[in-house]
A protein has these predicted regions:
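A short Gly-Trp-Pro
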Residues: 1-21, 26-149
Length: 149
């Protein structure tokens, strides 16, 4: 069995221009990630159930390369974001929304949909979305899911 070197992991870091897609390839996109961009983990019910790490980006750093007709969407009850899924394979690829606490309009991409990024290379920050506690900002340790910190 071949050993995996750190060089391989380092060459698949989450920075620069990256392409992403759903499982079947019907949805494709491109993003620009600044060096040092951290992934976000949220404890809201949707993020908890999808176990997603995302990158929060300004809308101009995201380009959808396929037609919107390939997508289905879901809007959460508090209407701060719209989540987009592939109509064919069901993978949630990205979301769009507006939240003043994260800088206004944003696109949130599913980091696991990036085609050439090693998921273990992503350093995460944590948000308390379950308690609508955006004003506290992110932190380096996970927020509790069932109790408020």
């Amino acid at each position: 069995m071949e050993s995996t070197s750190n060089t391989q992991t380092n060459s698949h870091r989450a920075e620069g221009k990256q392409r992403g897609s759903c499982h079947c390839g019907a949805v494709q996109f491109e993003v620009d990630l600044a060096p040092g961009t951290k992934g976000s983990r949220c404890n809201c019910s949707v993020c908890t159930k999808t176990a997603m790490t995302s990158f929060l980006l300004k809308p101009d750093a995201f380009r959808l390369l396929t037609l919107e007709s390939a997508l289905s969407s879901y809007e959460q009850g508090y209407k701060t974001s719209q989540r987009y899924f592939c109509k064919t394979c069901g993978v949630q690829c990205f979301g769009r929304g507006h939240l003043a606490e994260v800088g206004g309009d944003y696109v949130s991409i599913n980091a696991n949909c990036l085609d050439d990024v090693e998921p273990t290379s992503i350093e995460a920050i944590y948000w308390d979305g379950r308690h609508d506690n955006w004003q506290s900002g992110p932190r380096d340790a996970p927020w509790p899911t069932f109790t408020q910190a």
